[in-house]
């Protein structure tokens, strides 16, 4: 898992670094990460489904992207945001699968660190550094 995490971190950070300076802001980072994950999930022979709403979530939870196999079983799920949000953690916890990821991209390291309080042991957290 750690090698996948470091590989994914390096690839995503390189992708974000390519964004021209005038366009480097939250929504662009968010969508760029989602687009990258979409391609990665598709390359893994899974069908990427963006903006998934877990069926058991009544409060409007959402997950940015899931990967579904040929039997329609969810194999991986990703939530993306500047910091770890409780809503994202609850949405991921509603799914019964091993590969659950929260990817954060805020430049405010202290806020990201404070927000990891919400994380559960079953969720991988990946923070992307921006240069």
Briefly describe each language-model feature range.
Residues 1-7, 121-131:
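Non-catalytic C-terminal interaction segments of nucleic acid-processing enzymes
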Residues 2-56:
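Acidic-basic catalytic patches of nuclease active cores, encompassing PD-(D/E)XK
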Residues 8, 48, 65, 78, ...:
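Hydrophobic beta-strand residues in large extracellular and virion-surface proteins
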Residues 23, 29, 36, 52, ...:
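Phenylalanine-focused residue identity feature
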Residues 50-64, 83-87:
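A short, well-structured beta->alpha microelement
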Residues 60-77:
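Active-site beta-strand-loop-beta-strand hairpin of nuclease catalytic cores
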Residues 73-126:
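Catalytic cores of nucleic-acid endonucleases
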